[in-house]
């Protein structure tokens, strides 16, 4: 059951990333759709992070603390933790429209979504190993 939830979340991340990378932000509607897909993909990755923290027997806290816990447990490397933190910050900026969202940061983030997906895959594989 838990494994299925991880896989469902991973499929959701893949679907949102594919949408975001396949559509240009050529008008306001498409821009909003792409931003929503990025935001959703990151949120689902953070769900995976929280699920894994729980499966490691740790207390689930805020996203940044959960990322740090995975780093402390040697589940992820510092570069992966930094990637997760950056995307979580971008998600927050999109969700709350901080500082009139810098679209150049979004464009850069679009080019690295495959890296975010690879980290998500790694987390799901780690969870699979824990389940034995």
UniProtKB/Swiss-Prot annotation:
PANTHER family, per database record: RNASE YUTE-RELATED (PTHR33397:SF5), UPF0331 PROTEIN YUTE (PTHR33397)
Function: Probable toxic component of a putative type VII toxin-antitoxin (TA) system, probably an RNase. Probably neutralized by cognate antitoxin AF_0948. Neutralization may be due to AMPylation by AF_0948.
Protein family per UniProt: Belongs to the HepT RNase toxin family.
Record's signal peptide: none
Modification type O-di-AMP-tyrosine: residues: 98
InterPro entries documented for this protein: HepT-like, HepT-like_sf, Type_VII_TA_RNase
Active-site annotation: 91, 96
A GO CC term attached to the entry: toxin-antitoxin complex
Keywords per UniProt: Hydrolase, Nuclease, Nucleotide-binding, Phosphoprotein, Toxin-antitoxin system
Protein name: Putative RNase AF_0947
Originating species: Archaeoglobus fulgidus (strain ATCC 49558 / DSM 4304 / JCM 9628 / NBRC 100126 / VC-16)
EC number annotated for this UniProt entry: 3.1.-.-
Enzyme class: hydrolase
Posttranslational modification: Modified by cognate antitoxin AF_0948; probably at least 2 successive AMPylation events occur on Tyr-98.
């Amino acid at each position: 059951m838990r494994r299925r939830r991880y896989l469902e979340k991973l499929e959701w991340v893949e679907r949102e990333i594919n949408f975001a990378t396949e559509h240009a932000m050529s008008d306001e509607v498409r821009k909003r759709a792409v931003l929503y897909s990025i935001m959703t993909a990151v949120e689902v990755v953070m769900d995976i992070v929280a699920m894994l923290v729980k499966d490691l027997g740790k207390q689930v806290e805020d996203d940044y603390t959960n990322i740090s816990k995975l780093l402390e447990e040697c589940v992820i490397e510092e570069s992966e933790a930094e990637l997760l933190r950056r995307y979580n910050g971008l998600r927050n900026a999109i969700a709350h429209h901080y500082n009139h969202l810098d679209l150049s940061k979004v464009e850069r983030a679009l080019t690295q979504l495959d890296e975010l997906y690879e980290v998500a895959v790694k987390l799901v594989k780690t969870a699979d190993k824990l389940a034995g």
